[in-house]
Swiss-Prot record:
Naturally occurring in which organism (per UniProt): Pyrococcus sp. (strain GB-D)
Lineage, uppermost ranks: Archaea, Methanobacteriati, Methanobacteriota, Thermococci, Thermococcales
Name of the molecule in the record: DNA polymerase
SMART domains: HintC, HintN, POLBc
UniProt superkingdom: Archaea
Function: In addition to polymerase activity, this DNA polymerase exhibits 3' to 5' exonuclease activity. Intein encoded endonucleases are thought to mediate intein mobility by site-specific recombination initiated by endonuclease cleavage at the 'homing site' in gene that lack the intein. Intein splicing has been shown to occur via a branched intermediate that is resolved as the reaction proceeds; formation of the branched intermediate is reversible in response to pH shifts.
Amino acid sequence: MILDADYITEDGKPIIRIFKKENGEFKVEYDRNFRPYIYALLKDDSQIDEVRKITAERHGKIVRIIDAEKVRKKFLGRPIEVWRLYFEHPQDVPAIRDKIREHSAVIDIFEYDIPFAKRYLIDKGLIPMEGDEELKLLAFDIETLYHEGEEFAKGPIIMISYADEEEAKVITWKKIDLPYVEVVSSEREMIKRFLKVIREKDPDVIITYNGDSFDLPYLVKRAEKLGIKLPLGRDGSEPKMQRLGDMTAVEIKGRIHFDLYHVIRRTINLPTYTLEAVYEAIFGKPKEKVYAHEIAEAWETGKGLERVAKYSMEDAKVTYELGREFFPMEAQLSRLVGQPLWDVSRSSTGNLVEWYLLRKAYERNELAPNKPDEREYERRLRESYAGGYVKEPEKGLWEGLVSLDFRSLYPSIIITHNVSPDTLNREGCREYDVAPEVGHKFCKDFPGFIPSLLKRLLDERQEIKRKMKASKDPIEKKMLDYRQRAIKILANSILPEEWVPLIKNGKVKIFRIGDFVDGLMKANQGKVKKTGDTEVLEVAGIHAFSFDRKSKKARVMAVKAVIRHRYSGNVYRIVLNSGRKITITEGHSLFVYRNGDLVEATGEDVKIGDLLAVPRSVNLPEKRERLNIVELLLNLSPEETEDIILTIPVKGRKNFFKGMLRTLRWIFGEEKRVRTASRYLRHLENLGYIRLRKIGYDIIDKEGLEKYRTLYEKLVDVVRYNGNKREYLVEFNAVRDVISLMPEEELKEWRIGTRNGFRMGTFVDIDEDFAKLLGYYVSEGSARKWKNQTGGWSYTVRLYNENDEVLDDMEHLAKKFFGKVKRGKNYVEIPKKMAYIIFESLCGTLAENKRVPEVIFTSSKGVRWAFLEGYFIGDGDVHPSKRVRLSTKSELLVNGLVLLLNSLGVSAIKLGYDSGVYRVYVNEELKFTEYRKKKNVYHSHIVPKDILKETFGKVFQKNISYKKFRELVENGKLDREKAKRIEWLLNGDIVLDRVVEIKREYYDGYVYDLSVDEDENFLAGFGFLYAHNSYYGYYGYAKARWYCKECAESVTAWGREYIEFVRKELEEKFGFKVLYIDTDGLYATIPGAKPEEIKKKALEFVDYINAKLPGLLELEYEGFYVRGFFVTKKKYALIDEEGKIITRGLEIVRRDWSEIAKETQAKVLEAILKHGNVEEAVKIVKEVTEKLSKYEIPPEKLVIYEQITRPLHEYKAIGPHVAVAKRLAARGVKVRPGMVIGYIVLRGDGPISKRAILAEEFDLRKHKYDAEYYIENQVLPAVLRILEAFGYRKEDLRWQKTKQTGLTAWLNIKKK
């Protein structure tokens, strides 16, 4: 049995090594005679000698082609003659291949990217894991001493546990009196003892859980620090770290390192992938979790070490048990694909298919197509086609349902219609199958490459299903089920917390994309289009910041649609050198520099070191902005504006209001003409409502005139005369419902303010003075209100600074806009409610939620600079690095400052975060700053040396500035033509920012996207970088060698045709009602029929339809369900004849659902499905909400569990679990990523994060839980997803306390 293969180098030549197990013994076989090669297709075979002369250099050594032979192959089924070019060493291939490809005699090269050892296995027909050898498996796990914030492997390893079929033991270096614990003198001795265990037991397979990322790298690091060799390999070698995409993988020579984590993530969809969660999901048994802080506490105090040792031993034991279950499955996969299990267990589904096809292509003498380059990959991503047919479900509770499914619909179509790249539109063919709707033709004269391979795989899946039905072992059944359902879904989106700047109704706003899209979809529910799990809403009046792909110039383009999608899978948190960051799904694209241009790279393709596109400048609309105070006040509640009045001088307006109303009534035929009507008619003409003639008038805006009349009906009722000040006065609340009807020409004549206080004009011009005042406030200002001694409210705004000159300027500006102010030692105070309202509405109050006012973004550049100057004076400084530094606690404000700076052409920005404060560093000259020393050229104003090397083909020792680059081109030292390739980098609106960190995480929830007109890109993330909208384009495996868009759309077209054919025959000829269809299956019933009749007719139909379906297409009877209901597409629940409830899309399995929510949902499902009683389900919910309201639910059912996934200082949004964790950390408890926090939400005021306490600290005598929170955010959402299918709303499900009335209520009052 072959376990693995690699190669070593001796005397400059490769030697293949095959690691084997044979007759129970481990052995290594060597092959010194296999040479690396690639294929080349030449324009003319006579040029082979020219090609053979091509040379390259590798580490100072000349690389050349050492031999060439002409061979006959097939390419997509067609005969082709190519040259096989041989090389001395595998590393020669990447060194020379581009030179061969670029040679004028060469059309293309092939199979140049197949690793040498894998090539050997394919060519020699060797299959890993084939044979009946019994392999020795051993699992191990480590426990470490970790404190929050420590670097990786700083703390010692305190225990190493291992398990195999014979025993499970723990090695440690502190006294623990347990039979399975072996105690040694030190960490060093513990590692040496573990190495001895490995030598003695000599396992073929070493099993870990996340050993690639944690256990083995940690062990290697500690061994290095202790000066110990770690010869775990059978050849005496130490573990070898390898980069596989974005992750590190660890190889142990001669042994298979089987990291379960990768396999389980690929195979099973779980809400969390802790070892405990996986073990419970597979075996149905709980496993205790001991957290890092508990381990550290036990080790440091000596108390509880037995518990830690038991936990460590169980970790190894559980890892071994899981390994025993999963290893045979991966061994089968390794055998099928023909590649080593180490590689297979770490491969995506797409890569596994590729390796299978490569092996089969070699066997059939087919030349494998190349993987797509970046441009081709980008083109494929933009292609789209229609998917499977989904029928909206029939709502309601249904009895007697049958499930009918096509057996492997798409593979069956591929085989039946011979759908393959080599059969597509094949010339000279006698017989074709033509795909419906799309019209592509597939030749039937010979079997296509892919269809001929698929039948074996199809049969294998059917065999798995047969085994599942026959199996009585629940674990085996579950494992088989997981395997056949291992489908990975890619969504092309960004996460809800990411920021996006948009222009909506002419105003620049910065949103969290999740809040923005959710809000739009909630407000436009009837317009949302749903396709599977994806929701799309077409929109108007919204614009995004994008760039033109050709010119690289910034633009503002219309958003065509907003998109939301359910997603479970990996996401990538990408951090750039500037501090910008974004979290995106695997399939969403950012713009990466490649070969002189910007191309899209998906989340899983972006690598550390890549250069991403970020804005140098953005285009903001410029206009003279005016602040409408009335609009601000209308956003406040009536309680907040009860003391606000509007006033206007009497002079020139005596009797104006009544006269205008009488004139309007006369115009509408309700009164006689007033004597002074001409005065009012002239005013109406000035407002644009009428046009005066020599005699009479014409109404030119009747709708406007009617609204104006409504305004005056109200004004005449409420306006009062104030004789003391000879003014008319109106209470704002009296006209708040009509004030927006007042024309601006009239409104600007009024003043507005508090009843007995300061009043100001209704409009404020946003000039440079006002902008600077706002900048002062946003930087170091505060606005507050408080209850005064009279029971009313007092308001004040303060602007702080230590510099008298700055305070003088603050005082001057404050007086200009708000009249009298107070001056303190280090502040200027504006004790006026109107000032409070303006600053609070425009800028926010708390340091954590301040923002750049929207009106600043769309003002002139001079106004924007003035705001920044005020902000800089208040909250900026010149850092020792000679950079301007702006500081704030508000993440929203950081994004606003970045956008503002970009709009002024400032791109040399770096973002930081320390001690709870965000820093914005600017390395460019700003209008209001002076530098004594020359600044360094910042990263966004240089051409990186790797781009220079790629462009000009020579090595540059350092990056060079744009200015220097232009000089070198002008002086002829750099090739002008080549320089044109990157001209956009100097003259466009894009700069490049390097990726410095990538973290892969698991995410389950909604993800979001925008579709932007023409450009299909937009700014997103913290600090903003360009993201690509790929919603319409990512179908299939875009990196595939045998990619074929025509094939894919033909398969789905046939799929839609066959499922529709089945539906029609089932309904018209067998009397069924089809309730729901999803791509390859359906649910149906015969209303009113008995179960036996429905089953009998369904089986008859299956026989009937299968006789009509062509080729391998086969409909299967999947099962009968007593009862079921459908909510929406992909959301339904059924109960089978054995009483088992099956749900899809309704489950609440995540930890952040409390037990009461899960329990209530389960009872609701039982009431509906087992008893057929929806009213009973509603009653259950009402009883639970009543018990919650009366505090009758035990606290253990209210605990919500959430995991800490990153160091606490990295959290920007403080959820309840983070708040509890921070309080624990403040008490000295060590909190680390992976720790699960259980909390209960208490009754009270303020945000939930401040009212959440640790579950163990909840005391019934002291605490009351927040019943409203648990009803509104836990129980009702859990059951609404079910009961909304039956027409129930949230308010129908709550227990309502009956209000006492009449005599009973009076008697109760009297008793008190």
